[in-house]
A protein has these predicted regions:
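Alpha-helical segment of the N-proximal tetratricopeptide repeat
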Residues: 9-44, 51
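Conserved structural position within tetratricopeptide repeats
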Residues: 37-40, 70-74, 107-108
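TPR/TPR-like (Sel1-like) alpha-helical repeat modules
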Residues: 87-114
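Alpha-solenoid helical repeat scaffolds
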Residues: 16, 47-51, 81-86, 101, ...
């Protein structure tokens, strides 16, 4: 997965790793709290906004999730991870046309094996 993470503070990666574990342990409120603090500390880190969007989405807070996803893409437009997280946030919010627009936006900039796989699965499903 391509990702422009050069210059990303190590604490961002550490916190995201912890947050993924918290979500897996169904401790979403604590994960949200940690990401809100991370975004406050690193407001220009697209990856932090993208993971906050993902966690908010898992809580059904789709409007807030989409807002943070948009910020993430603006801050890190060439990050595949950011784009994929935003795509999933939009998809889970039933914003399918916007999700497909995000996919098209990213694949126009970069090759993406993961998006290629998603497209293949959609074609198999007749979408």
């Amino acid at each position: 997965m391509s990702d422009l993470t050069e210059g990303t503070h190590p604490r961002v990666f550490e916190t995201i790793s912890q947050v993924v574990e918290l979500v897996a342990d169904n401790r979403v409120p604590l994960a949200t709290e940690r990401l809100v603090a991370l975004v406050a500390e690193f407001p220009r880190e697209g990856l932090a906004h993208a993971y906050l969007a993902w966690v908010l989405s898992t809580s059904g807070r789709h409007r807030d999730a989409i807002e943070h996803g948009r910020v993430a893409v603006q801050l890190s437009p060439r990050s595949e991870r950011v784009s994929l997280l935003f795509f999933r946030v939009l998809w889970s919010a039933d914003e399918r046309p916007q999700a497909l627009d995000e996919m098209r936006r990213f694949v126009a900039l970069e090759d993406s094996e993961e998006y290629a796989q998603i497209i293949l699965e959609m074609e198999r499903a007749g979408m």
